[in-house]
Amino acid sequence: MKIALIGYGKMGHAVEKIALERGHSIVCHIDQGEEALMDTPEFRSADVAIEFTTPATAVDNYRRCLAAGVPLVSGTTGWLSRRAEVEKMVADSGLAMFWTSNFSIGVSLF
């Protein structure tokens, strides 16, 4: 699977390590200030984007992923006041989004 990582902190590094160990490839890393990379062919080639950022940037990241045609998994918390907006955005895109607030078990099972 080709994965784009959005947010390259502790969780991003952990996901990358496990993904590579399992034979997946990381097509791009996007960290704070590098959001324009979501407009690149490398990003659009991803099978999925895995996003761990901040509440202030998460919804815009979701929008950019969906606009690029990339389904996403997010572990970012603190944006639920905008849940209806995000649900509509995902439904309108025809793509998928998976969100959970606790990846401690998820990372172990990845």
Regions picked out by a protein language model, each given a short descriptive name:
Residues D39, D47-A67, G78-R83:
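Beta-loop-alpha module in the N-terminal Rossmann-like domain of NAD(P)-dependent dehydrogenases
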